[in-house]
From Swiss-Prot:
It comes from Shewanella loihica (strain ATCC BAA-1088 / PV-4). Belongs to the KAE1 / TsaD family. Fe cation binds at residues 111, 115, 300. This is tRNA N6-adenosine threonylcarbamoyltransferase. It is an enzyme of class 2 (transferase). The gene is tsaD.
Amino acid sequence: MRVLGIETSCDETGIAVYDDEKGLLSHALYSQVKLHADYGGVVPELASRDHVRKIIPLIRQALKEANCTQDDIDAIAYTKGPGLVGALLVGACVGRSLAFAWGKPAVGVHHMEGHLLAPMLEEDVPEFPFLALLVSGGHSMMVAVEGIGRYQVLGESVDDAAGEAFDKTAKLMGLDYPGGPRLAKLAAQGEPNCYRFPRPMTDRPGLDFSFSGLKTFAANTIADEPDDEQTRANIARAFEEAVVDTLAIKCKRALKQTGYNRLVIAGGVSANSRLRESLAEMMQGLGGRVYYPRGEFCTDNGAMIAYAGMQRLKADQLEPLAVKGMPRWPLDSLPPV
């Protein structure tokens, strides 16, 4: 089976062609970072319009790079949600239209299931069951994964997601958009133990996250301290360490609760090197293993949508003809495969 994957949930237009025997045949991505930089964040209307401009050229590019035509495509998978409703509708409309015109089946994919399954694109893949930490700009959640579609959300953010906290704190520090990677780069220049930030919700039972208070703590620290480069780097490091420690503490707690010894990290924040190092060290100490996608598949992309969609298509979980985007869509509401 050969699937065309379409991702348009936020500010990246991602197109990919995935073959169940040959693997990933092509992967085309356009990022809107420059478009939104002047606004310090994603502007939904601008994001939707840019998806409209870029999606067809990227589909042509992906098909060309995969050395195939529409006749070689067996099915189409597109991101149905969650995400920005206008952006979702662009991908859904194009995906459904191509499916109708080409006479192919189509399926709407859950964006976070795409992230969760992104490590399956690598050569070394995790076996079920495993614990998944999904951390991005819009979501932070801990999921027990027994199989595809067999998900139990153990904890999630009650306010700001981890990636959102990174971006907002970076903005408070005067860093350009996208703030998360820039804050991490600044933190690498910081000295340890200069500031002690709280580790939110780690002093109580449960696996939920809260990062809004940490962001406020960072804002107060920034306001009270000198505005020189080294001080800013030290604050950035303290903030990053607090987020990473919080995530690691929650992961360790969840692993003990589930009895699993395999951990998957996915989503945009999974590209953070300090987080990867911390969780790898933790899992080594626990006698387990950690898995994550390569850097280009940490952020939104069409490859993960093509792969996740293929699993649904093989189970004959097809979509009706109606075009629908779902800005809110609980991960654990998905049917098993």
